[in-house]
Amino acid sequence: PYQAEVAQTDAEYKRSRCGRKTKLNDKLRQIILNHLRLSWSPGMIAHEFKLATKSIYNWLNQGKIEFSLNDLPEHGVHQRRNLDQRSKYNQSLGRSIEQRPIVVNRRNRIGDFELDTIVGPRGHSKAVLLNLIDRKSRFLWAYRLKNRTAVTVNEALNKFLATFNGPVHSFTVDRGTEFSGLVSLEAQYGIKTYYCHAYTPAERGSNERFNRNSRYFYPKGTYFEHISAQGLKTTLLEINQRPLKILDWQTPYQVMLTNLSKNSD
């Protein structure tokens, strides 16, 4: 498998480097290119291989690494999603994000989740991905849904709640009709839901960033009916095992595991 080959190449490079001054040779060029193709950012690569982030950008700008800057995970301005399904009555749905407590805003604990859906080709595909990301650890879950209705979303969330062995305190969502049924989960589980202001994806910043990165695995136009359960599992494994600067270069998996262990003590 491609990722296994990448891991083997990484290990060989780290053993051979042994404190030497970094020069861009063929082996290092291929390592950087491999990870860029896996949607790693230059910062992630620099930390993992003890390089200077600026050096990677310089090599890219100079054409020494053949990879377009436009294809970097965080490059450019993210366009607003078409919110055609946000009906006027949804503007008064539920509890506003303005009421979200400080402990959630500061990401002090696991169990506060941002939710969103990623759609396939409009008018041609009903299946979507439901994404849940823990605000503290940035750990991501995703479910393939047959459609984008509130009933189907609630079914997936009930499945998540039955299998996740950690705390679930809150959901933060946009005002899409697919999230209009979360009030029933609050009554059943005591999970509070906070609705963002209309047209403000930045209020779910973690989820929006992971949605952008997920497009590496599932480009626009993907028919989610055609993705396999194993394929989705592999994608989540790859995303959750990437070291993140915001986590002091730990992975979401490491942070989630550490916090779950603390909760079980």
What residue spans do the PLM features occupy?
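Extended, domain-scale alpha-helical bundle/helix-rich regions
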Residues: 31-59, 64
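Acidic/histidine-rich, metal-coordinating catalytic segments
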Residues: 166-181, 199
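Basic, flexible linker segments flanking DNA-binding modules
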Residues: 3-6, 51-107
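Short, basic alpha-helical/linker "hinge" immediately adjacent to a nucleic-acid-recognition surface
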Residues: 1-35, 48
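Mobile genetic element proteins and their domesticated derivatives, centered on retroelements
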Residues: 32, 45, 56, 116, ...
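Active-site beta-loop-alpha junctions of metal-dependent nucleic acid enzymes
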Residues: 119-121, 125, 142-165
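Charged alpha-helix within mobile-element recombinases
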Residues: 30, 34-38, 48, 162, ...
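An active-site-proximal beta-strand-loop segment
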Residues: 101-140
